[in-house]
Amino acid sequence: MPLQFMYGPASIDHLEGIADRVIELQQQNVGQPVYYLVPNHIKFQSEIQLLQKLRQRRDVKSHIFAEKDVQILSISRLAWFFLRNSSIYQYPRVTSSSSNMLLYRVILEHQDELTLFHNIDAQLGLVQKIATQLAEFKQGNVGPDELGRVAENIAENSDAGMDIKAKLHDLGIIYSAYEEEIQSRFIDASDITHTLTDELSKMDLSGQSFIISGFSNFTAEEMSLIQALMKANGNVVIDLIMDKFPLYEKVSENSLFFENEKIIFKFNAWAHENKVKSLEPVRLHRVRVNSDLLKLEKYWIESSEGQVGGSKQENNACVTIFQANSRYAEVEHVATLIRQKMAKDPSLKFSDFSVLTRHLSDYSTIIKPIFDQMELPIFYDLQIAMKDHPLLELINALFDIRAHHFRYEDVMRLLKTGLLFPETEDDPHGMDFFKSVHITENYVLKQGIYGDRWLQKKDWKYSRFNDIDEEKQTDEEIEINQRINTVKNYVAETVVPFFNQLSTATTGVEAAKALYDFLIKNGIDQCLLAWRDQWIEEGRLAKAAEPEQTWETFIQMLDEFVDILGDQPFDPDNFMGLLNAGFEGATYSQIPSTLDQILVSESGMVQMVDRKIVFIIGATDRVMPEQIQDNDFLNQDGKNQIDPFLDDDQFLRISNDRQMRQEPYLNYLTFMIGSDELIFSYPKSGNDGVELKISPYVERIGKHFGIIAQSLPSRPTTEPVRLDPPFIELFIGSNRSTLSHLIQYARAMHEAKSEADPRWNLIYTILRQSTLGSLTDQLLSSLEYKNIPEKLKPEIVEGLYGDTIYASVSKLEEFYRNEYSYFLKYGLKLQERETSDLSPADTGQYFHAAMDKLIKMITTENLNFNEVNQEQIEQIAKRLVQQMEQDQQFDQFNGTYRMGFLRKQLDRTVQAMVEAIFKQLARTRMRPIASEQLFGQIGSQSGLPALNFKVGEGKEINVRGKIDRIDKIEIGDKDYLGIVDYKSSNRKFDFTDAYYGLAMQMLMYLDVVQRNKEKIDPATKAEISSALYMIFQYPLLKSKEWKGSDANQLNQSIFKKFSLNGFLLKDEELIKEIDKTIEDTRKSDVFPIAFTTKGTLTKVSENSILSEDELQNLIKHAELKVREAGEKIFKGELDMNPVQWPNRRTVMEYSPYKDVMQFDAMLPENNYRIIEKLDKDKVLEQIREEQEKNGR
């Protein structure tokens, strides 16, 4: 029953020595088994490699080889090997989820006895920490009784803090109760190990051998197991990494191999005490790395122990360091290097390479896409967590919908899992339904829908009212209405019955049954199986295993919940907390790599040393050395207080200080994984943009060996760069990746106007001859690309617009603001995604509807404005607001409290507008005779004839719209008609904009009025009086406007804020009579007119007055601009010519199409259309001259 140690530094081929020892033991104990015990993570590869070495030693030529007396096992598999027929394996294994549930139940049942856990509901996260702590106790051979003893000793120690005393008091109670529960129904890994230890102690293992390798430390229970092997007369050989065997009892904490030396001393002391024979240690000598890596090893061992030595490298190529600008550039260069090394050395295989980093999560979204592009196969040696699977997301969303009462985010999360949909013959996989979901999401966002509106019986109504041309109930809108109501009804009909069932559940088992029934009834299990079958068909076997494993894990957790907490009162929050906690630790089973693949793994994990070239990426000071976090339930200080009271065979996980001291050793193991080459790399900045620094370990190595870290550019340039290897080689990888860099280089060369490097010309030639030839030419042609829209082909114009363009005036104004933007918006019909925030179009629609209702009230009730008092005005305003609340098209205001608040703000403005309009009408003889007057066909409605303009052979433009308000005034024997246009901000008639086609609306409206005077007012032959803007606003006064003012003065100041702007006809009688109060003040508070003391119009007022000829010329000019716009649109002309006004304001400032247009004023081909500032007289003069010139 001897104990023997084998040792040697990491540069030695330990597996060779183990293979030799296996054969020796077999020869010494013929027919007896040899067990090779390794960490579970490397068991599969260890088995393959050891058998290969044994096959070579036995000179077996066949590739098929087996050893019946050699077993390669992990410790857990060793337990199965010896105990598989015992009763212990009849018990269900405790999982992380069942452990959490048991602890949760234990804490609930003993809450009155506990000090820290009065409210476990609020501390569910602590349950996981306690579970981890109890597992550490069990692995440390510290049972409930031992913990109770320790707690008593510490409680008697006056120096101990109250925190540790309270924690140990509670842990003692919880641990004892937890173990009682475990023993009665489950078995966990520690119990199995302890049972194996007990059973082995009773066996006679004489002649049987156990070789243990790959461990950096052992838990107390693992040490007890190994000691049991020796007690049972087994031959135990422990293989450790160290350069020399310790000769003295005292271990130096400065030694790189401190932990391994402690293992030796512990086992030797135990062997001596138990009279177990210790054989002479065996020093392994067969070196597996090259001379440069041996020098690195020698330096690292000596420098870590304070003895700096070593010599310069003979070949700098064996250890290199490079810095990249980003993690992306870093990984891209690693992949490029792998391809180049394989190209230069055909004997290299993918499996000769390993890419390691301390935390793969830093590179989780980078490595696979880059290696796929580089056509490099990888084995991603990291277990994938189940917690992000759609099944768990569906259950979480389901419970969140119930908890937050149909919040938008939760409902969409549920529907977007892809698992819940109505299965029909026409749509068996729900593809059409998911299209409806996306449409519904846009509608819900726009309307701000949540809560009871998902449950209402009344159908949702989809409508668009931000543009008059969109008011027609199109077939598309009818379809959208059907789709959104299909989704609404499906959600209500599907989840509400489940919620009702869950509400009646009083115990955990009733709730679990309700959830299970819901999932089965809605075919969730069948959908998961369909996913599996689809991925199997596509050959994605690893992906295909995920749905089934997730479902099995969920069912197991549900069974555990029913078994452990089924009789407890049901709490939805705690149920989901336990379910999420269970999935947090659940991972998919991974198939070990047997293919020729590059290993991508984490450097903190034990690795096989079967690679030739190792890349250590992300070698920064943040992770090398690792920053140890102390997040355990018992912190390090607490464990230090426990340690003196533990027996020799009891100890907890190594301390944080010892972990930090072990960092040089763990990194040393990583350095020595490869046999031929070691390459360090690190990025200048992380994913968060924070600057990163090189690891002090790597910095030490570089400084000692004179290795200069190369700072590698992320893209090629035309400037000469001195690097080794040559600069150009940095960018030659797969055809696809090389093409990307060729484009970058060509662009840099194009911009610098320099000659191309002949080597890049050669690369271009090679790529053109490859399968990427056409793509290469296509991408290179982009260098000549200019951001200039192409003229549309006639067939495209025909498809977009037909023979007739139906447009509102505002659309045509948008054309003159930027022709390309018009094409995007009205040709391609690109729209921004609507949200529940109020847009200017939404508020404008609301105000327009309110004013329309008001004007109809006024004309219907035939009010006398001179006699209406303040109280009556307020009553009318109140009635108007009530009517608006009942208008279904504004249901979006019922979506949220915020929208309700905004509606109150709008209503307050409406009430102010009502009062202002009544006061204005009391001062003038102008009276509204029409509101929202249609012209042209809009949807199913029609009004006055549209304005039709021929713009070429068979083409025409049909201008239609709504005039907000038409007013009429009678002066003497003459009648006048004027228009009022509502605006959300102060507006004056801008003659410059009118000239350039940017302000045609008022002029075209007047054109409609004068063409249809008899239809508007058949009893009269009216003339045009005015075109005026009225602002929608809730007026605010500046301090100078209200200071020292009485109530009447304040009301007057507020009233002035609503004064109308625009222009009036130059008609002396009209101007004098339009405002009855103007004689008193010489200035109208309603209209833009004022008189001097001499009785003439002021200069400002002159700008608001137009003669009949001037007005007609402006209208003709607007008609001309409409025709010109139509001609350009039908010709397919698409200039990107955004307007820039004289104040340097541009139309691009608020354009939603910036990302589409990519307009850049710095580009020579992109220019603003500069608008020259013109005053009224200049505009009228230029229009007159142009019309005379063209004979109009």
Swiss-Prot record:
<dbReference type="GO" id="GO:0016817">
    <property type="term" value="F:hydrolase activity, acting on acid anhydrides"/>
</dbReference>
<dbReference type="GO" id="GO:0004386">
    <property type="term" value="F:helicase activity"/>
</dbReference>
<dbReference type="InterPro" id="IPR011604">
    <property type="entry name" value="PDDEXK-like_dom_sf"/>
</dbReference>
<keyword id="KW-0540">Nuclease</keyword>
<dbReference type="GO" id="GO:0003690">
    <property type="term" value="F:double-stranded DNA binding"/>
</dbReference>
<dbReference type="GO" id="GO:0000724">
    <property type="term" value="P:double-strand break repair via homologous recombination"/>
</dbReference>
<keyword id="KW-0238">DNA-binding</keyword>
<dbReference type="InterPro" id="IPR049035">
    <property type="entry name" value="ADDB_N"/>
</dbReference>
<keyword id="KW-0234">DNA repair</keyword>
<dbReference type="Pfam" id="PF21445">
    <property type="entry name" value="ADDB_N"/>
</dbReference>
<keyword id="KW-0067">ATP-binding</keyword>
<dbReference type="InterPro" id="IPR014141">
    <property type="entry name" value="DNA_helicase_suRexB"/>
</dbReference>
<keyword id="KW-0269">Exonuclease</keyword>
<comment type="subunit">
    <text>Heterodimer of AddA and RexB.</text>
</comment>
<dbReference type="GO" id="GO:0005524">
    <property type="term" value="F:ATP binding"/>
</dbReference>
<keyword id="KW-0378">Hydrolase</keyword>
<comment type="function">
    <text>The heterodimer acts as both an ATP-dependent DNA helicase and an ATP-dependent, dual-direction single-stranded exonuclease. Recognizes the chi site generating a DNA molecule suitable for the initiation of homologous recombination. This subunit has 5' -&gt; 3' nuclease activity but not helicase activity.</text>
</comment>
<dbReference type="InterPro" id="IPR038726">
    <property type="entry name" value="PDDEXK_AddAB-type"/>
</dbReference>
<dbReference type="Pfam" id="PF12705">
    <property type="entry name" value="PDDEXK_1"/>
</dbReference>
<keyword id="KW-0547">Nucleotide-binding</keyword>
<dbReference type="InterPro" id="IPR027417">
    <property type="entry name" value="P-loop_NTPase"/>
</dbReference>
<keyword id="KW-0227">DNA damage</keyword>
<protein>
    <recommendedName>
        <fullName>ATP-dependent helicase/deoxyribonuclease subunit B</fullName>
        <ecNumber>3.1.-.-</ecNumber>
    </recommendedName>
</protein>
<keyword id="KW-0347">Helicase</keyword>
<dbReference type="GO" id="GO:0008409">
    <property type="term" value="F:5'-3' exonuclease activity"/>
</dbReference>
<comment type="similarity">
    <text>Belongs to the helicase family. AddB/RexB type 2 subfamily.</text>
</comment>
